[in-house]
Amino acid sequence: MLFIFYIPYYPGLGDFSFIINSYATNAIFLAAYALITKSKVDKIKFPIVTMLLVPLDFAAMLAGGLVSWGIVSMPYWLWGDWRLMDELARYRGELGALDAIVGGIILGYSASFAFTKVNRKHLVISWMLANSISTLVVAIFFVPHFCGMPPYRC
């Protein structure tokens, strides 16, 4: 999820752009984390783990979307009232932050295998914060440009 906001999309590459952006951003984030925390990187596992983070990135977005969908749909399931479900679905910024937390847990734990010795809890929290901050940046700066377009409310 983090990669969408930091590396621009190149239309000429098509779907392959997703793979390049995801790999580059995950590798940059892990390298920066290793430098900041002075963690030791396993030179053999690092490229393998960053390659495996690409499909996990997509899976984390799907998992976060399912969690958000479950939360939005819960009032309808419990009380049969669709109005609250419709109101919650309009505010994607809050649900995007929830997606970022779920994605941060999945990616942070998986990324910990690229290090020889690392505090997994700290890495997961760092990944969750990075995803949440990038989601809030998009919600604050880019969502207002979509005013009037469903599902955004202005």
Swiss-Prot record:
<keyword id="KW-0472">Membrane</keyword>
<feature type="transmembrane region" description="Helical">
    <location>
        <begin position="58"/>
        <end position="80"/>
    </location>
</feature>
<keyword id="KW-0812">Transmembrane</keyword>
<keyword id="KW-1133">Transmembrane helix</keyword>
<feature type="transmembrane region" description="Helical">
    <location>
        <begin position="95"/>
        <end position="116"/>
    </location>
</feature>
<feature type="transmembrane region" description="Helical">
    <location>
        <begin position="123"/>
        <end position="145"/>
    </location>
</feature>
<dbReference type="GO" id="GO:0005886">
    <property type="term" value="C:plasma membrane"/>
</dbReference>
<feature type="transmembrane region" description="Helical">
    <location>
        <begin position="15"/>
        <end position="37"/>
    </location>
</feature>
<protein>
    <recommendedName>
        <fullName>Uncharacterized protein AF_2166</fullName>
    </recommendedName>
</protein>
<keyword id="KW-1003">Cell membrane</keyword>
